[in-house]
């Protein structure tokens, strides 16, 4: 009987994976409206993440990464152990927490095999996400603004209007805890829509400090978000408070909210920029070593490291690398030194903003535009990027 059941589950899973292989996958984030929830449901949400932390740490403490009884766990408090009941988490939520610990060990093992230096799996101070593994069981869509979660109840959410409920297929979801509140990230699959194949223009991109993004057509993009005076004041206040106290935790949560808001602003700008580039252009760029830029010391108030920290270079680079039609040069390729006319190299210090070739006399008034110039890229590769489609 059990073998027959497992066989049906295996066949059903295989059919689902085959069907979804030809569909578009995306994740939609919806926010739980805490002001429309009862105190009991808010307490359950809080307890879910607290119990998930207890269970995760109990699993990590075992040698086999498994527990026979997950109804209660031992928690270390001030040097002694206390028994805590796991009442709010459903059975499938408990399974997801245990699986996440095993997956983390597997990821560490893979990193170690690649030669990376790894340590042992550590205990968590806070659990920030819980996997809701099965649609229709662990969670359900009740209406256009309500989601039901096992052992918690019906939650009022904002953002379900992004989804056409009749045309998508739901997979798993994640219950997320952020400084700004609670969220549910829904994984959905939809049928691929036929897209017209249009010719895209091939342009070069240079990443820099004075101008963050310089394109070969002369367009420049700059976006910085410096620390606000409010954030600086909160950081000073936090340094004077007792670590671990309630006031310390409240101040830390306010700081995290500000950082989350700034991160959302940067992501919004990068996503809009990436959409325009992906739809209309094939980008040729260089694999800049941004981590080394962060370590560069400068006497100026707004130095190299801070420009990288407050800017969007890292986010833009990650988006460009994920697009398979773009072309990335190695970081060691001398694009700034190469002359697009004769191909010779001429070194220029960072304070020289005008490019001048000492061999043939070629001159470009903006060294960043010269670095992003497609003629320079073609000289470096000794091929025609337009002819080869840059793909």
Task: Go through the PLM ranges and name each one.
Residues 2-99:
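Gly/serine-rich nucleotide phosphate-binding loop at the start of the catalytic core
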Residues 3, 8, 25-28, 34, ...:
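Positively charged, helix-rich recognition surfaces that bind polyanionic ligands
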Residues 18, 171-174, 189-195:
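Catalytic micro-motifs at enzyme active sites that drive phosphoryl/nucleotidyl and oxygen chemistry
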Residues 29-31, 146-148, 169-174, 181-187:
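Ordered hydrophobic segments in well-structured contexts
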Residues 49-52, 97-105, 251-262:
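Short amphipathic alpha-helical coiled-coil/interface segments
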Residues 59, 96-109, 369-380, 384:
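Stable alpha-helical structural segments in soluble proteins, enriched in small hydrophobic residues
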Residues 61, 71-74, 112-123, 246-253, ...:
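Short coil/turn segments at secondary-structure boundaries
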Residues 75-176, 306, 310:
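Acidic carboxylate diad motif detector
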């Amino acid at each position: 009987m059990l073998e027959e059941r497992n066989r049906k589950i295996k066949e059903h899973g295989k059919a689902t994976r085959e069907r979804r292989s030809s569909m578009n996958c995306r994740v939609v984030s919806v926010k739980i409206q805490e002001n429309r929830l009862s105190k009991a449901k808010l307490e359950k949400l809080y307890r879910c993440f607290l119990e998930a932390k207890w269970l995760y740490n109990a699993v990590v403490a075992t040698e086999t990464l498994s527990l026979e009884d997950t109804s209660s766990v031992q928690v270390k408090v001030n040097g002694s152990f206390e028994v805590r009941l796991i009442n709010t988490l459903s059975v499938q939520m408990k399974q997801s927490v245990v699986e996440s610990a095993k997956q983390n060990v597997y990821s560490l093992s893979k990193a170690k095999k690649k030669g990376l230096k790894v340590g042992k799996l550590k205990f968590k101070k806070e659990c920030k996400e819980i996997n809701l593994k099965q649609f229709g069981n662990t969670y359900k869509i009740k209406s256009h603004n309500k989601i039901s979660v096992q052992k918690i109840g019906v939650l009022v959410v904002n953002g379900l209007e992004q989804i056409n409920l009749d045309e998508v297929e739901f997979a798993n979801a994640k219950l997320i805890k952020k400084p700004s509140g609670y969220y549910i990230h829904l994984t959905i699959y939809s049928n691929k829509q036929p897209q017209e194949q249009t010719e895209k223009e091939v342009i070069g991109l240079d990443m820099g400090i004075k101008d963050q993004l310089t394109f070969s057509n002369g367009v420049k993009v700059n976006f910085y978000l410096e620390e606000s005076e409010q954030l600086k004041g909160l950081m000073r206040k936090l340094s004077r408070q007792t670590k671990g106290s309630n006031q310390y935790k409240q101040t830390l949560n306010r700081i995290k909210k500000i950082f989350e808001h700034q991160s959302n602003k940067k992501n919004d700008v990068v996503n809009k920029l990436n959409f325009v580039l992906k739809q209309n252009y094939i980008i040729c760029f260089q694999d800049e070593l941004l981590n080394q830029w962060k370590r560069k010391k400068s006497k100026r108030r707004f130095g190299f490291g801070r420009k990288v920290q407050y800017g969007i270079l890292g986010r833009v680079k990650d988006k460009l690398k994920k697009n398979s039609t773009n072309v990335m040069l190695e970081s060691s390729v001398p694009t700034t030194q190469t002359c697009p006319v004769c191909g010779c190299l001429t070194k220029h210090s960072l304070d020289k903003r005008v490019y001048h070739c000492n061999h043939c006399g070629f001159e470009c008034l903006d060294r960043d535009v010269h670095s992003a110039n497609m003629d320079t890229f073609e000289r470096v590769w000794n091929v025609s990027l337009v002819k080869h489609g840059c793909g």
